[in-house]
Every structure is written in structure tokens, then in C-alpha cells.
Amino acid sequence: MTIKVGINGFGRIGRIVFRAAQKRSDIEIVAINDLLDAEYMAYMLKYDSTHGRFDGTVEVKDGHLIVNGKKIRVTAERDPANLKWDEVGVDVVAEATGIFLTDETARKHITAGAKKVVLTGPSKDNTPMFVKGANFDKYEGQDIVSNASCTTNCLAPLAKVINDNFGIIEGLMTTVHATTATQKTVDGPSHKDWRGGRGASQNIIPSSTGAAKAVGKVLPELNGKLTGMAFRVPTPNVSVVDLTVRLEKAATYEQIKAAVKAAAEGEMKGVLGYTEDDVVSTDFNGEVCTSVFDAKAGIALNDNFVKLVSWYDNETGYSNKVLDLIAHISK
């Protein structure tokens, strides 16, 4: 069965979700809603400064996109309730505007005829969050779910492996995070986050993130045990998590590496990766795993206190897991 998907919001994540869907036989994008006009939408899809040219044909006909010969309905509705998803048979909406992140607001997609909705960001209410490699097995048929954040998608699988094998007493996370669309090219007004208004290409910017606390929502056994912060850095894509934890069960760094490697080659294949190469951030541009453990970068102070490092393409990895969640809730 092919799952018919509508995308609301054609920004960074909306477009990368679209690109990733072209490589899957189980998912078909049938509609896109954004306030951009179709010609500009086609241009934004064709050319990407980070991920290169679109691998396929993109045309515009009668105000709609024709991608690889298939028509995709284009609309420009501000209110999701008016989207008439049922007219094009949409099963699941990828809600990628960053605006409709509660059950109440996202439910407008259901009103408009969609069966289910996946939020491509952490929910702002109690809408359940699901992370592949952490808690997909806890899905119970809810019609609106969240794919959490890109950083939670990196942290949760690694934290689960460490906690399952050695037990986490407590931990702190830092994500060294690539620039995102909310930042400023030069210093500009940012009333809620003064540091966040400083020029993105000129600064390392400390920032808050709910990613570590959100792990406690997808892995309740870690609730209250993790928190963290972010440094925004002047790179266009690919971020890295630094997780420093105290372990219940003593373990050498070699034992930790072995446990992560076993998970990466076993039950978490395709989610958690493992490398012993001398890698840097650009080596992960286009990486579909949401967390790639860097065995050489981590360090242990002793057998109970360790720093672990894991890379993620905050656009590609996350967008691929949005599609995995869409497929999972459509079974």
C-alpha cells in the first residue's frame, strides 16, 4: 500500500522530507501547502545550497508541481482547516510549518480530511512524541503525533543503548548545532532570545534546547535524569551531540564502544551508526542515520563517568525519520 502524504510548510524540513520521499516506494507526496507560489516552490526544490540539485525533473503546470511526471497539488491556505486533504486522498500530513504544534491546531488537518498528522518538531502540549530507535513500539494508534526534534532523535537512541546496558544515573548534553533558519545573517532584533539575534556567521551562540529533557518523554526511565544546552555555530548543516553521563554499572570505554557497535549493527541499524574513522562534520552531510557514534571522539574519566559523541545531519536524518514515523503510524 502506498501512503499518500500532504506536506504543510515547504521550508527546510518540508523540502528535505519531499526529497527523501522520492527514494521510497511506500510513500507518495500528493499535495503541498505553502504561501510560496508554485514557480518559486519549484525553484526551491530544484536547487539547494546544502544538499545540491534535486535528482529528478521539476516543472510547473496550471499552478501545480509536476515532479518526475507526477502531479502534486499546490495550495496556499493560511488555515489548515481549509485544505481539503480528502480531495487528493491524503492519509497523513507532515506538519512542517513550525506553527501548528499542538493537538488543537494540528487537528485542523483532520477536519480537512486527513487521517493522521505527524508534527515535524517537538509538540508544545502533551501530543505524544515518537523517536525511531527509542519508543516506536509504544505507539497506540493516536491520530496526531510528533517526531520530536532532530537533536532528540540523535540523543535518544544513544541514551537508550547506554541506559539499557549500563544504567544512567544522570547526564548533561551539549549539542554543537549548525545554523538554522530562525537565526540572523547579521545582528538583528530577537526580543525573546537576545543572543539568538546576533550574526549567525560571526559567532558561537549559546542557546537553550529542550532536546535532552524531551528524551524523558520518549524514554520515561530517563525522565529527570538528563538536561542540556546548545551552541549554535557558523556551519550550514550537520550537528554533534556531546553526552556526558554518570553510569550505574562500571564499564570501560571499550565496553561502551562494543555495546553501541552491537546496537548499531543489530536492532538499531539505520537509526544508530558507529564509526572509528577520523571524521568531521561535513562527512555526515546526507546521513540518514539520526545518530552516528564517534568512537574516537569520546573519552572516559573513569569507569563511571564518560563523555560520548554522536553526529547527525539535522536535516536529512530527521526528515527520513519523519517518513519512517509516517509509515509506522500507517500500518
Swiss-Prot record:
Its EC number is 1.2.1.12. GO terms for biological process: glucose metabolic process; glycolytic process. The record marks 177 as: Activates thiol group during catalysis. One of its GO terms (cellular component) is cytoplasm. This is Glyceraldehyde-3-phosphate dehydrogenase. It is an enzyme of class 1 (oxidoreductase). It is found in: Cytoplasm. Homotetramer. The keyword Transferase does not apply. The active site is at 150 (nucleophile). It catalyses: D-glyceraldehyde 3-phosphate + phosphate + NAD(+) = (2R)-3-phospho-glyceroyl phosphate + NADH + H(+). Belongs to the glyceraldehyde-3-phosphate dehydrogenase family. Pathway: Carbohydrate degradation; glycolysis; pyruvate from D-glyceraldehyde 3-phosphate: step 1/5. Keywords: Cytoplasm, Glycolysis, NAD, Nucleotide-binding, Oxidoreductase. Catalyzes the oxidative phosphorylation of glyceraldehyde 3-phosphate (G3P) to 1,3-bisphosphoglycerate (BPG) using the cofactor NAD. The first reaction step involves the formation of a hemiacetal intermediate between G3P and a cysteine residue, and this hemiacetal intermediate is then oxidized to a thioester, with concomitant reduction of NAD to NADH. The reduced NADH is then exchanged with the second NAD, and the thioester is attacked by a nucleophilic inorganic phosphate to produce BPG. GO terms for molecular function: glyceraldehyde-3-phosphate dehydrogenase (NAD+) (phosphorylating) activity; NAD binding; NADP binding. D-glyceraldehyde 3-phosphate binds at residues 149-151, 180, 209-210, 232. NAD(+) binds at residues 12-13, 34, 78, 120, 314.
